[in-house]
Amino acid sequence: MICRVDYGSNDEEYDGPELQVVTEEDHLLPKREYLSAAFALSGLNSRASVFDDEDYDEQGGQEKEHVPVEKSFDSEEREPVVLKEEKPVKHEKEASILGNKNQMDTGDVQEELVVGLSEATLDEKRVTPLPTLYLEDDGMVILQFSEIFAIQEPQKKRQKREIRCITYRDKYISMDISELIEDDEEVLLKSHGRIDTHGKKTDQIQLDVPLPIRERSQLVKSGIVRDTTSESREFTKLGRDSCIMGELLKQDLKDDNSSLCQSQLTMEVFPLDQQEWEHLILWEISPQFSANCCEGFKSGLESAGIMVQVRASNSVTEQESLNVMNSGGQTQGDNNNMLEPFFVNPLESFGSRGSQSTNESTNKSRHHPQLLRLESQWDEDHYRENGDAGRENLKQLNSDARGRLSGLALQDRDMWDESWLDSIIWESDKDLSRSKLIFDLQDEQMIFEVPNNKERKYLQLHAGSRIVSRSSKSKDGSFQEGCGSNSGWQFNISNDKFYMNGKSAQKLQGNAKKSTVHSLRVFHSAPAIKLQTMKIKLSNKERANFHRPKALWYPHDNELAIKQQKILPTQGSMTIVVKSLGGKGSLLTVGREESVSSLKAKASRKLDFKETEAVKMFYMGKELEDEKSLAEQNVQPNSLVHLLRTKVHLWPWAQKLPGENKSLRPPGAFKKKSDLSNQDGHVFLMEYCEERPLMLSNAGMGANLCTYYQKSSPEDQHGNLLRNQSDTLGSVIILEHGNKSPFLGEVHGGCSQSSVETNMYKAPVFPHRLQSTDYLLVRSAKGKLSLRRINKIVAVGQQEPRMEIMSPASKNLHAYLVNRMMAYVYREFKHRDRIAADELSFSFSNISDATVRKYMQVCSDLERDANGKACWSKKRKFDKIPLGLNTLVAPEDVCSYESMLAGLFRLKHLGITRFTLPASISTALAQLPDERIAAASHIARELQITPWNLSSSFVTCATQGRENIERLEITGVGDPSGRGLGFSYVRVAPKSSAASEHKKKKAAACRGVPTVTGTDADPRRLSMEAAREVLLKFNVPDEIIAKQTQRHRTAMIRKISSEQAASGGKVGPTTVGMFSRSQRMSFLQLQQQAREMCHEIWDRQRLSLSACDDDGNESENEANSDLDSFVGDLEDLLDAEDGGEGEESNKSMNEKLDGVKGLKMRRWPSQVEKDEEIEDEAAEYVELCRLLMQDENDKKKKKLKDVGEGIGSFPPPRSNFEPFIDKKYIATEPDASFLIVNESTVKHTKNVDKATSKSPKDKQVKEIGTPICQMKKILKENQKVFMGKKTARANFVCGACGQHGHMKTNKHCPKYRRNTESQPESMDMKKSTGKPSSSDLSGEVWLTPIDNKKPAPKSATKISVNEATKVGDSTSKTPGSSDVAAVSEIDSGTKLTSRKLKISSKAKPKASKVESDSPFHSLMPAYSRERGESELHNPSVSGQLLPSTETDQAASSRYTTSVPQPSLSIDKDQAESCRPHRVIWPPTGKEHSQKKLVIKRLKEITDHDSGSLEETPQFESRKTKRMAELADFQRQQRLRLSENFLDWGPKDDRKWRKEQDISTELHREGKVRRAYDDSTVSEERSEIAESRRYREVIRSEREEEKRRKAKQKKKLQRGILENYPPRRNDGISSESGQNINSLCVSDFERNRTEYAPQPKRRKKGQVGLANILESIVDTLRVKEVNVSYLFLKPVTKKEAPNYLEIVKCPMDLSTIRDKVRRMEYRDRQQFRHDVWQIKFNAHLYNDGRNLSIPPLADELLVKCDRLLDEYRDELKEAEKGIVDSSDSLR
């Protein structure tokens, strides 16, 4: 029965049986409208409802005796509290509790009730039916319970309530409480009704009466409440979120009384929704009450619907309930201090049932919905009890009780039966402890939602349960539910499956059948998610052995490291790198006299092996002896020693699994890289049947093993048995009878198939029996060998890809590279603030510099460190690393990228470098002639079976359903087995158009070859006799033919022809194929045919890879033979490793093998493979340098200077590195030693063009600042072919010489200011035609084959200075042309060929052309800031001659290009002026273009005051000798630059690299520097290089001149003819005219003092002085930058505001340089005075201010004096020339 009570008004109502159920809306009403939660909690305390908010079973404080209690219960004679009444009770009528005049508050009503129970009832000695309340003073009756139950008809409502709660019964009925209650809580619900309580002397009876309570009212206590100590008042409470129901589950209740457990198990308590409690309501059938009922109880308690519960408790106060203590109801007892439990059921009559029925009905009514509503509204803060306030309220209650309760009416008198006392539930004096709610994050069945913060990221990585966030979404944007529908939120709490229409449900069900529920979630380890186990860049060896990684079992010597080990610093102790075969290296410092045993002892600490363990050390392929010292065995400093460990350790406990508290699978397991080890856990070996699987997982990536079982019938339960078997692979997935197979093949009914599934692919696996002798050998990075058992071994079938592999030059590839770079940068920024720019360029070489800058500007700034190297510095504001860093690049994307690299590497070795779309391949093949179709078909086949094409084809067809598998070839070129055991994922070529078909038929008809379609040969046109002859050819008997008509003969011919053509018969003019007809099939027939083909291939693959039954019956001989073959293969591999990779080692090894084993064939590596090995060795050497150059102290203290030292793993700059280059790449001919052709190996690789933007200062000077830059430069020159871009200067045409690329005012023009009378004939490209041709404008270079049939030597020798002199002497005698040969490597495949440059007096265009892809190479000597000296690339010719890679061009090995050379019979001035300067532009070929050749004229610096040289043969010899010297010097410089890509400049020149950053650093400090102008710095460097170079030339020339003068004993007068600008038509003169002109010039030179007019002289001495002083200034600015950096530029006002006020004559080096260029200095003293002025100004301004600056100025003047003294002779001659010039002018 449910009653609604409104205590806010004086009227109550009773709604009858059609009551409304309490809902959650009731809780939102004001507190004054409803009954307080105190009564509800008091009534439900013993029941521990599921919805209870407080825990009342906790143990209270120690109970004390209560003094006011004088009476106790008697065991024999006991006075019941409730009296019995015989009058009938009517339940339909209700009376008012309060009158309209006087409304009492909660405290008043409570006081009156307490007094009644305390004073009146316990004085009576006889049993009364129901209790009666009396006044304490006069004993007047206040309330009788009999009157409460006497009202039979409900009264109408007197006034409207303020707020009425509307409840809905249906809603409550729909709530199934059984779903909220688990099985283990059911016992508790049935047993918590009875709790025994032990009381010592005073057991209180509490009457819990809910009354209206106002916000600030206080509870009144009387009797025992008044004298209760503070200890008894304390009561342990739980929070609102606690659940009392679960308390007994913790087994914390300690009770010695066994009756408690018995009472809990005997009682039956059912939830409210499981019992029909409405049938238990009594309507007008209550029994009669006795006449002895007291008349005192006249209260409206029953009309208010109050459930009265009387219970005994040792606690005094409960803050959540109103306790009414009855001290008078206690009786004395001799041996029993405990009251029997009893319970009052206010919903039915007390006399209608016995004790058992009463208990049952009481327990059934305990879960009253009204009580649930009332208990949630309790607020304990409003019901604090106060003793003093209680006494005052009690007095007020006693005085006004009669008037306040006079309006109460009697309603019911059903409490006479004392059987209800047996139902009283007594509270225990021991409290139950608080239950602990445990959230297990490792429970995989749990799902927790956490906010988007840092804790979510941590929990997702470490928790075994699922951690989700409301704002997060899965990668595909949706969350798949088990019902197959996508909900708006992840948990799909809206039950969308019940609201779907039929069509959508059927569609989703169909899609679910296609995928058949088998998508398991794959977890990766934390290192794999962070990409810690994956390399950023794969080496060539790793790409070549991508599918079969090659382990190193024999020490391999690095040739590059061997060549460089002597060059590295060797002072002090000797450093040695000890490296294990596992790849771990360690740097050790030892003495040269130490033994190998000492070295092993030191290495044992680093490589974790015991000193007693037997290990071997190898150096240069030889094993080192322990007793001898390192010096005796010729171990050089900075060398690499390999450590070989031979002891095998056993792991008997490797099978153990982690403990119970540790997770066995990600993300809870494998959180560190050290966890990814074979030291523990189970090991499965899987071998792929494919030679090159499409995709492979990296270390740390997860995979799911599962077994699919196909039901043979709907009743088949064998799949459940598989789940219980221990030998089943992975989880078992049962396929229903109608489900489709998850593989291309069909899984037969009643059979199972295991598979391995990842996010990338799915492949079937076939278990094999593991031999007892099979073990796994594990080698660690430090070389330790261990042996452990293997759990299982399986063979993996063909992969079915689930994702597409990246294709080259696609948007996905670009996005991946950018994301990979940013993920790397973000992770690096977590640990450091700077990343070297070279590091990103080297690690991500496929990304252009512009792209790198674009994305790096978001989080960093490009700066320069203290060493002047560019680096990316993290922005200060960029402190937040993106939360989705782990999802930026998925591990599957890395595997896809690596698979693409492996495919590209294979195509590269096949010679395929250009790619096209698969759709255009068939179109291209149709247009090729027949003789080229075979080669083109091979290329097309290789392009079709690339990983990206195969995966794309399969994924496209599979996503549309297995029904579309007919779009694949299934059989053909894509079969990885090559013999019908695998599927071909090549997509079927689209049908050709009708026009192409018609063209093919027409072409076939022209060739006389019939087609198979039958359209060209119609048997219906045959006559009877012709048809008879055809049938006779078909071996049809003549008797049968004679009986047939023409129509029958035609049908027979067509039938037999079609059958034989379908069976593979030949097609020809005389065969039956000419009459065949193709059979057309429907789409369903094609699907069925494809399905049958898949089943056949699947069955063959399954039988081939499954373990045979007779594997265990293998004989020992067969096993031994397999072992012998394995040993033989292993020996061959070791021999190959021992033989080395170089040519010499191969030759020596072959000689040994020939002598021992006879003829042995060995595959010689191709040139591409050699280049790849060189590149890998260079990368290994970089790592070796990192170990050699690192400082151990800095490493320990972690104070490495900067990341700008390379990649962070690259060595710092060194000044004494010797260049390295393979000798076979540089070769010169003896007759042309001064012409060095820049050669490189052109390899067919895919071009990844990088849009590099360089500053103006980098356009002329190419800086090699770090080892990465040098290695990148060499790799670019040796491996990649770049397209040269024609500059705007190429459109210029010189008006003097007619050449392209410059104007006539350019000082590099051959005819710049040249004397017109002595001008030789100009060599230009328009010489043969008279005007520039189109080929000239396009920059084509014409090459002429040399008629010399003598082959050029394969290995050319170097030229010395003496040989060059001889060549010069021999060539000086003939004025004709000379042939100059140079070697260039032509990469058309892998063949090395040579080219010749023919230097002649005129150009001859020929038919052969040279094309180039290389960038523009300036052949002018460039200054290298690393070397600090000029690099004379070539005084005349430099560049590359790279012919095209066509087969016919590769066959020819010699070409010549016409390069002008001056006649050697003219004098020095003519020879100087005729020095060639040409720009030979590359051709504009479409496919193959070669490098550009730039031939620039060297700058002329001569002394005009010396006498003119005589035109003698000795001068020509001297000129040639000088050119040879320059060539030899240039060759040495180029060797230093090209032999070693780790070329570091000298110590002093490293300061030049710092110059770029000097201005920036000084600007930051606010001192006296500022940035250089880029263009000015570039000009300075070029001028410095030229001045230094020509100074050496002039010095050598003068020394030769002095020796010649001593021999001839006569003086030579030096002079220079004035050069006048030539006319435009000078270059068109004929050769005969040129000879005459030369003769005239020679005569004129001999007699010029007599006949020639006085020419206009230049300031020859002043120019020489200016050149020398400028070189001194440049030396001070560049070489001595550590001294002069403060005096480079004028002091600005910003740097020193009062500088000009103190210093009246400011001076700086830039001002001095400008004065030198304006030729303002007449002698050296003026120059020195200005430098002294700098010193004076520094002392004048900085003395007393900046004490560190004046010493620098003093040192600057000292260095200037030293330089002036060094150039003393030259300055003296120049000053003398100035004096002579001034004298002559006077």
UniProtKB/Swiss-Prot annotation:
The record's account of tissue expression is: Expressed in roots, shoots, leaves and inflorescences.
The record, for PROSITE patterns, names: BROMODOMAIN_1, BROMODOMAIN_2, UBIQUITIN_2
Q: Where is this region: Disordered?
A: 54-83, 350-372, 1303-1382, 1397-1471, 1596-1634
Q: Where is the Bromo domain?
A: 1656-1774
Instruction: Point to the regions of Basic residues compositional bias.
Output: 1303-1313, 1397-1407, 1604-1613
Compositionally biased residues, Basic and acidic residues: 61-83
Q: Can you name this protein?
A: Transcription initiation factor TFIID subunit 1b
What organism is recorded for this protein?
Arabidopsis thaliana (Mouse-ear cress)
Classification of source organism: Eukaryota, Viridiplantae, Streptophyta, Embryophyta, Tracheophyta
The gene designation is TAF1B
